C-alpha cells in the first residue's frame, strides 16, 4: 500500500535558483520570512529564526555560500541556500563559485564533487554521515574486476558515487544527461554503474548496449507499478512522473520520466491539473510553490540521508569549520577529469 502524505508547505526549485541576495547583502531572518510566508507557517519559522539569522551572518563573515539539493527542506532551501538544484546543476554551479567557503547541503558524494571542482576552497558538509545507498553499492575494486571481465569497454559512472569510484571511471553522468554521456563515447557497449534501474531505463532510449551493476536508490526502488495503478484509481486523471532511478516497470507505467530538473520543467510546461512525482518527498513540495493551479498528489518516500542536513548542523559547520571535505590527492586528478569530461558535454 502506497503511503500518502498531505503537505501544507512547499519550496522553490529550479535547475538552479539563486537568491537575489547573496553573501554580500544584509538580510535578516525577519525580512526573509516575507518571501517564505506562503510555504512555512509563522510558528514554525519562529523556531528556525535564530539559526537562520546566525547562518546569514556567518556566511557574510566567512564569505561562504550554501549549495542545496532539491531534496532539502524549506527552511534550508528558502532560508539560507544561495544556489539550489539537482546534482548536475550543483556540479555546474560549483565550478563558478567565487566564495572562500562552500557548504554543501546534500549528501557526501555531492560535497566531494564540489571539492574536486574547487580544490583550493574550503568545502564543508554539515553531517559526514549523510551518505547514499548508491554510493555504497560499488567500490574501485568492483570496477577493476569489471574492466577485466569487459576489456576495452568504457566505464560511465553515476555521480552518486565516491571520489575513489569516479577516479576509477572514464566519465561521470547524472540522471539528467546519462543518455547524452553514453552516446558521446561513440562505442557499441558501455559499463554504466552503479544504478541498475537507471541503466535499464536509459537502455530503452539508446542503441548503445549498457552493462549494468546491481546498485539501487533506497528511495526510488520502493515505488511499484501497483502504486501507480492505485494512484490512478484514487486520483482519476492524474499525470504520473517517475524518476529514472525507479524500477523499469514503474517508468513504463508512468506518463513521463526524467530527472528532478526535467520533472519541474514538465510541470511548468504542461501544467497538468493533477500530478504525482515519484521521487523524494521534498521534490513535490518544491515544485508546487510555482504552480498553485496544479494539484500535487504526494507519495512519501523520504531520503534519510538528505534529511540528516539541518539548520543546526549547517550553523555548526560554519561556526566550527566542522566536517571539512578532503579528497586524497592520489585520486583527485582522475576523479576530477571524469566529472569535468561530463560537464563538457
Curated annotation (Swiss-Prot):
Q: Name one GO molecular function term.
A: 4 iron, 4 sulfur cluster binding
According to its UniProt record, which reaction does this protein catalyse? iminosuccinate + dihydroxyacetone phosphate = quinolinate + phosphate + 2 H2O + H(+)
Signal sequence annotation: none
Kindly state which keywords UniProt assigns to this record, in alphabetical order.
4Fe-4S, Cytoplasm, Iron, Iron-sulfur, Metal-binding, Pyridine nucleotide biosynthesis, Transferase
The answer to whether keyword Iron applies is: yes
For this protein, the Enzyme Commission number is 2.5.1.72
- For this UniProt entry, what's an example GO CC term? cytosol
What detail does the entry give on cofactor binding? Binds 1 [4Fe-4S] cluster per subunit.
**Its annotated pathway?**
Cofactor biosynthesis; NAD(+) biosynthesis; quinolinate from iminoaspartate: step 1/1
Q: Which domain of life is it from?
A: Bacteria
Q: List cofactor names only.
A: [4Fe-4S] cluster
Task: List residues binding [4Fe-4S] cluster.
Answer: 132, 217, 303
Q: Where in the cell is it found?
A: Cytoplasm
Q: What does this protein do?
A: Catalyzes the condensation of iminoaspartate with dihydroxyacetone phosphate to form quinolinate.
The similarity comment for this entry is: Belongs to the quinolinate synthase family. Type 2 subfamily.
Q: PANTHER family, alphabetically?
A: QUINOLINATE SYNTHASE, CHLOROPLASTIC (PTHR30573:SF0), QUINOLINATE SYNTHETASE A (PTHR30573)
Q: What is this protein called?
A: Quinolinate synthase
Q: Which organism is it from?
A: Agrobacterium fabrum (strain C58 / ATCC 33970) (Agrobacterium tumefaciens (strain C58))
**Gene from which this protein is expressed:** nadA
Amino acid at each position: 500500500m502506497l503511503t500518502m502524505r498531505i503537505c501544507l508547505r512547499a519550496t522553490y526549485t529550479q535547475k538552479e535558483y539563486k537568491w537575489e541576495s547573496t553573501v554580500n547583502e544584509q538580510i535578516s531572518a525577519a525580512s526573509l520570512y516575507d518571501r517564505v510566508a506562503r510555504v512555512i507557517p509563522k510558528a514554525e519559522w519562529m523556531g528556525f529564526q535564530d539559526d537562520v539569522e546566525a547562518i546569514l551572518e556567518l556566511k557574510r563573515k566567512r564569505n561562504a555560500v550554501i549549495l542545496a539539493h532539491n531534496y532539502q527542506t524549506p527552511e534550508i532551501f528558502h532560508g539560507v541556500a544561495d544556489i539550489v538544484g539537482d546534482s548536475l546543476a550543483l556540479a555546474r554551479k560549483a565550478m563558478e563559485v567565487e566564495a572562500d567557503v562552500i557548504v554543501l547541503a546534500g549528501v557526501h558524494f555531492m560535497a566531494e564533487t564540489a571539492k574536486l571542482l574547487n580544490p583550493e576552497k574550503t568545502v564543508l558538509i554539515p553531517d559526514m554521515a549523510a551518505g547514499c545507498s548508491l554510493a555504497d553499492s560499488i567500490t574501485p575494486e568492483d570496477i577493476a574486476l569489471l574492466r577485466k571481465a569487459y576489456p576495452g569497454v568504457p566505464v560511465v559512472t553515476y555521480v552518486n558515487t565516491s571520489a575513489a569510484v569516479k577516479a576509477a571511471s572514464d566519465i561521470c553522468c547524472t540522471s539528467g544527461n546519462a543518455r547524452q554521456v553514453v552516446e558521446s563515447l561513440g562505442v557499441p557497449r558501455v559499463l554504466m554503474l552503479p544504478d541498475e534501474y537507471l541503466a535499464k531505463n536509459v537502455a530503452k532510449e539508446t542503441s548503445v548496449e549498457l552493462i549494468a551493476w546491481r546498485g539501487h536508490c533506497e528511495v526510488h526502488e520502493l515505488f511499484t507499478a501497483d502504486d501507480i495503478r492505485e494512484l490512478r484509481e484514487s486520483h482519476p486523471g492524474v499525470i504520473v512522473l517517475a524518476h529514472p532511478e525507479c524500477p523499469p516497470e514503474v517508468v513504463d507505467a508512468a506518463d513521463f520520466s526524467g530527472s528532478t530538473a526535467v520533472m519541474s520543467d514538465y510541470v511548468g510546461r504542461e501544467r497538468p491539473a493533477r500530478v504525482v512525482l515519484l521521487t523524494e518527498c521534498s521534490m513535490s513540495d518544491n515544485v508546487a510553490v510555482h504552480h498553485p493551479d496544479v494539484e500535487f498528489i504526494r507519495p512519501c518516500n523520504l531520503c534519510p540521508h538528505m534529511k540528516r542536513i539541518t539548520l543546526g548542523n549547517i550553523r555548526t559547520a560554519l561556526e566550527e569549520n566542522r566536517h571539512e571535505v578532503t579528497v586524497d590527492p592520489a585520486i583527485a586528478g582522475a576523479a576530477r577529469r571524469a566529472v569535468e569530461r561530463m560537464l563538457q558535454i
